[in-house]
């Protein structure tokens, strides 16, 4: 109806913010195939989080831009992010993905198999990421994706940057914890760790970072 106040679509509810509208548009612009949707359903079944479609599309693009021959992932989950990363990697690229939960790795492996991804293109490692990462070679990865417990983000950033070759990209998911990291009044352990990870990236002169407001926040940085 002409002249209607559009500040709220639902009586008593605040109108969505510009950021919320942009995020909804970004998410709605991405369509996922049946394999990704099935992997996402399995993530719900086993109680593990998964990147949103828009974050997945960003990962695919960054994997392609970085060269995508060697990618490391901290936090396998149900394989949703792995599928997106592999979609942007080169045909002979190898995804090394780490998770402490064997069930996550099993479900992710099922998703990779259903997508027709050969076993030579994935390396699934069960263990604590802090320990596994120290065994990976310096300057050897095109992209490192961190999607694990926010408390440990600073450790993963330090190790992840070490792994990057020149021109490689580190990507940290849940970099804003929704809007919590940006609220000065919030100072719990998770937020403190996320802010420390962001500080480490911002103060590393080898890195050029950008914070992307998708999902729970994506902090990406390319290494000189």
Swiss-Prot record:
GO terms for molecular function: O-methyltransferase activity; S-adenosylmethionine-dependent methyltransferase activity. Its EC number is 2.1.1.-. Keywords: Methyltransferase, S-adenosyl-L-methionine, Transferase. The keyword S-adenosyl-L-methionine applies. One of its GO terms (biological process) is methylation. Gene3D superfamilies: Vaccinia Virus protein VP39. Signal peptide: none annotated. PANTHER family: O-METHYLTRANSFERASE RV1220C-RELATED, O-METHYLTRANSFERASE-RELATED. S-adenosyl-L-methionine binds at residues 51, 73, 75-76, 81, 99-100, 149. It comes from the Bacteria. CDD domains: AdoMet_MTases. Residues 1-11 have a biased composition (Polar residues). This is Putative O-methyltransferase MUL_4520. It comes from Mycobacterium ulcerans (strain Agy99). InterPro entries: Cation-dep_OMT, SAM-dependent_MTases_sf, SAM_O-MeTrfase. Substrate binds at residue 147. It is an enzyme of class 2 (transferase). Residues 1-20 are annotated as: Disordered. Belongs to the class I-like SAM-binding methyltransferase superfamily. Cation-dependent O-methyltransferase family.
């Amino acid at each position: 109806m002409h002249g209607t106040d559009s500040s709220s679509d639902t009586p008593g509810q605040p109108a969505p913010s510009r950021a919320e509208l942009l995020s909804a548009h970004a998410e709605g612009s991405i369509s996922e195939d049946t394999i990704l949707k099935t992997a996402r359903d399995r993530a719900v079944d086993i109680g593990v989080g998964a990147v949103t479609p828009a974050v997945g599309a960003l990962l695919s693009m960054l994997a392609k831009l970085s060269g995508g021959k060697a990618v490391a992932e901290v936090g396998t989950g149900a394989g949703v992010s792995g599928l997106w990363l592999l979609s942007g990697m080169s045909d002979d690229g190898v995804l090394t993905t780490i998770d402490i939960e064997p069930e996550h790795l099993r479900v992710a492996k099922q998703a990779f198999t259903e997508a027709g991804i050969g076993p030579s293109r994935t390396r699934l490692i069960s263990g604590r990421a802090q320990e596994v990462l120290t065994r990976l070679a310096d300057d050897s990865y095109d992209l490192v994706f961190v999607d694990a417990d926010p408390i440990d983000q600073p450790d993963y950033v330090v190790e992840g940057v070490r792994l990057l070759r020149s021109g490689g990209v580190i990507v940290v998911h849940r970099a804003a914890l929704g809007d919590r990291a940006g609220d000065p009044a919030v100072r719990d352990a998770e937020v403190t760790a996320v802010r420390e990870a962001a500080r480490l990236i911002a103060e590393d002169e080898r890195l050029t970072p950008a914070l992307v407001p998708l999902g729970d926040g994506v902090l990406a940085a390319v290494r000189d």
